[in-house]
Amino acid sequence: MAGAKEIRTKISSVQSTQKITKAMEMVAASKMRKTQDRMSSSRPYSKAIQGVISHISKANIDYQHPFLIEREVKNVGILIISTDRGLCGGLNVNLFKTALSEIKNWKEQNVEVSLGLIGAKGIGFFQSLGLNIKAQHSGMGDTPVAEELIGIANRMFEAYKEGKIDAIYVTYNKFINTMSQKPIMEKLVPLPELDNDSLGKNSDNWEYIYEPNPQTLLDSLLVRYLESQVYQAVVENLASEQAARMVAMKAATDNAGNLINDLQLVYNKARQASITNELNEIVAGAAAI
């Protein structure tokens, strides 16, 4: 059995670690709430653009933007959004499993796959696999800036317009609630058929005058909409990261508390044994006299 002094040192070490994990839990909780607010505030913007795009595209316009046209899929682009930091449980592992499963499915259909990576963890993982990486970005911090994300997104979109990619998907961790985050893959382009519910039940009867013309407006709005979708995915993934980190740090704090209790019990037994030995020595010495 370890000595009492050694056990006290272990208890002190675990207590120090417990303070760190508790602080990280509280910081993650605060950041998660801020990210949730950012996530909620960006949704109406994306929804409003979606409604206008739907109305224009259904207004009998003789113009079809490339982002709205389905074509034979020979090359697929996947934008994978991971975290820059660890200590967030199995968040990235589950995301990578989802992405690898989809990549495998595409390759079994003889479809080439190109990746766009956001997040240091994803960059490190997929680079080690030797996959085709078109673009990458890391170092977003806790408050991602849309302008910094537009570059990597536009490189994927330009490849689509040039015919180098036939479809683009985004993979990220969708924030369900504090205890649940789900890795999902969503199609970015060609855009799935949009509805115009956000414009109201009688939106089909509304007449608009578009300046300078519907084609120019649609071109601009589609790019803005896709950029907002990428930003929304990044923010949702960030909220998932903070939630997962908060849960992981709480579990670590609780485990540290249990370990301290166990060590305290061992310490008490060691101290009791030490006192018993001392008493036995005293009794033995007295008997010898």
UniProtKB/Swiss-Prot annotation:
<dbReference type="GO" id="GO:0005886">
    <property type="term" value="C:plasma membrane"/>
</dbReference>
<keyword id="KW-0997">Cell inner membrane</keyword>
<dbReference type="Pfam" id="PF00231">
    <property type="entry name" value="ATP-synt"/>
</dbReference>
<keyword id="KW-0139">CF(1)</keyword>
<comment type="subunit">
    <text>F-type ATPases have 2 components, CF(1) - the catalytic core - and CF(0) - the membrane proton channel. CF(1) has five subunits: alpha(3), beta(3), gamma(1), delta(1), epsilon(1). CF(0) has three main subunits: a, b and c.</text>
</comment>
<dbReference type="InterPro" id="IPR000131">
    <property type="entry name" value="ATP_synth_F1_gsu"/>
</dbReference>
<dbReference type="InterPro" id="IPR023632">
    <property type="entry name" value="ATP_synth_F1_gsu_CS"/>
</dbReference>
<keyword id="KW-0813">Transport</keyword>
<keyword id="KW-0472">Membrane</keyword>
<dbReference type="GO" id="GO:0046933">
    <property type="term" value="F:proton-transporting ATP synthase activity, rotational mechanism"/>
</dbReference>
<keyword id="KW-0406">Ion transport</keyword>
<keyword id="KW-1003">Cell membrane</keyword>
<dbReference type="GO" id="GO:0045259">
    <property type="term" value="C:proton-transporting ATP synthase complex"/>
</dbReference>
<dbReference type="InterPro" id="IPR035968">
    <property type="entry name" value="ATP_synth_F1_ATPase_gsu"/>
</dbReference>
<dbReference type="GO" id="GO:0042777">
    <property type="term" value="P:proton motive force-driven plasma membrane ATP synthesis"/>
</dbReference>
<keyword id="KW-0375">Hydrogen ion transport</keyword>
<dbReference type="GO" id="GO:0005524">
    <property type="term" value="F:ATP binding"/>
</dbReference>
<comment type="similarity">
    <text>Belongs to the ATPase gamma chain family.</text>
</comment>
<protein>
    <recommendedName>
        <fullName>ATP synthase gamma chain</fullName>
    </recommendedName>
</protein>
<comment type="function">
    <text>Produces ATP from ADP in the presence of a proton gradient across the membrane. The gamma chain is believed to be important in regulating ATPase activity and the flow of protons through the CF(0) complex.</text>
</comment>
<keyword id="KW-0066">ATP synthesis</keyword>
